[in-house]
Amino acid sequence: MSPHFSLTTPLYYVNALPHIGSAYTTIAADVLARFYRLQGYQVRFITGTDEHGQKIERTAQQRGLSPQAHCDEIAAGFQALWQQLNIHYDRFSRTTSPRHHAIVNEFFQRVWDNGDIYLGQQQGWYCVECEEFKEERELLEGRRCPIHVNRTVEWRDERNYFFRLSKYQQALLDHYAEHPDFVQPPSRRNEVLSFIERGLQDFSISRVNLAWGFPVPTDPEQTLYVWFDALLGYVTALLEPEDEPTLANALKTWWPINLHIIGKDILRFHGISWPAMLMSAGLPLPEQIFVHGFLTKDGQKMGKSLGNTLDPFALVAQYGADAVRYYFMKEVEFGRDGDFSETRFVTILNADLANDLGNLLNRTLKMAWKYTDGKVPNVQGAAIPREHPLRQLAEHLSQTYGQGYRQLAFHEVCQQALTLARAGNKFLDEEAPWKRYRAGETAAVAEILYCVLESVRLVAYVLAPIIPQLSEAIYGQLGYSIRFNGSIAPDLLGDRQAQWGVLPASQPLANPEPIFQKLLLPATVADSP
């Protein structure tokens, strides 16, 4: 039986259409899901939408829509963007579904039966945007939210139900000590630990005077807090379509989740509240939470007030899915903050994909049509000496790329693959097969061309989780009918295609065509100072 790997993005809040940060998270999750599928794993990749809460209620009211109609429209927008970005998720979890309601009620009952929910008085400053109470020490000048800096917080004084988070302080510290990789990168782990060590306070899990949400099972006059509800969307997504919606059915195959991928703004919910809730319900904790940074544009924080937001729909429509996927995976070290510059975007894509990779394939194919009758040279890859410069680099890549993906070091995978592509260009220039062909050195020419074509194939395979359409096009020009989208052919599974010497001798090649057209900067960007 194939091993399992389950991963999630956050369930995105549907106050507005997806922004570039949501796209960034989901691209990374899709890349990892594709890698594990190629490794032969059964994968459950979960994304979806978080659809309850006061913010949704207010936004829908402002738009003249019912909350459900608003949620349906925005959820469809997320699904449309994921399709444009070639995101192959397995489950799209919506927290307004009746099946989710059943899971939430059962989970609540477990926590209630464990004595971890009680009625208390809640006073404090509340950010509607975050759907969260803020401590006084966190607030910016003018009682503004530290995350939504243009929003002032509201004073709340109400009687709510609380979860005994403080009860799990030591259990959380013990878990972090026993599982040092539970939250990564280390800077984020240290941030969570510091917060826990300062002392945890019980948090409210219900709201009054809020219609848009699930009622508290033990008190229908109150509504469950959006985060208590939303986090359980990861569990609901594990149900098979035919399953009765129970925790036992949801958890029987895919739990615990191997990896949650989140942004740093929701770290406390995932790194503190969520594991404590699971402990209370007697459920295993996720294996790992990986936290990425924020994106800026041209070195500035993005925001509507600054007029510098980056529309992911427009970006994909202009440049294509693979271009967007490649830039963010290669240029932003996952786990750190990153920047988008359209000038750099175009420069990187032209240099890496059009020149280093695309041009190498194109020129080598043209020579193969001219010198080896339009076929892969009649050379056995295994017979190429191990000290051959391209084989050495290729075998190093095949041995290290998997670790790069598993550690979410996508930028390193891209750099290693590019190193081989650039070496292929250098090797071709130095060996000058056109000169050696004229000198009658046909065997040497065949070996040169084989080594370059095999290097390009390996680069395409290694980068397939990031640029699946381009990798498929490269394989097609090398004479394969292999697909990297949809169902995966058995020939692609495992590491077989990651080895040196896979390209069959004498395989007919396709006519050379550019795989990636050079990009042009829009005039408005090109003319800006």
Curated annotation (Swiss-Prot):
Monomer. One of its GO terms (molecular function) is methionine-tRNA ligase activity. Keywords: Aminoacyl-tRNA synthetase, ATP-binding, Cytoplasm, Ligase, Metal-binding, Nucleotide-binding, Protein biosynthesis, Zinc. Belongs to the class-I aminoacyl-tRNA synthetase family. MetG type 2A subfamily. Pfam families: Anticodon_3 (PF19303), tRNA-synt_1e (PF01406), tRNA-synt_1g (PF09334). A motif ('HIGH' region) lies at residues 12-22. Binds 1 zinc ion per subunit. ATP binds at K304. It comes from Thermosynechococcus vestitus (strain NIES-2133 / IAM M-273 / BP-1). PANTHER family: METHIONINE--TRNA LIGASE, MITOCHONDRIAL, METHIONYL-TRNA SYNTHETASE. It catalyses: tRNA(Met) + L-methionine + ATP = L-methionyl-tRNA(Met) + AMP + diphosphate. GO terms for biological process: methionyl-tRNA aminoacylation. This is Methionine--tRNA ligase. Zn(2+) binds at C127, C130, C145, H148. Is required not only for elongation of protein synthesis but also for the initiation of all mRNA translation through initiator tRNA(fMet) aminoacylation. It is found in: Cytoplasm. InterPro entries: Anticodon_Met, Met-tRNA_synth, Met-tRNA_synth_2, Methionyl/Leucyl_tRNA_Synth, MetRS_core, Rossmann-like_a/b/a_fold, tRNA-synt_1_cat_dom, tRNAsynth_Ia_anticodon-bd. Its EC number is 6.1.1.10. The keyword Iron-sulfur does not apply. HAMAP family: Met_tRNA_synth_type2 (MF_01228).
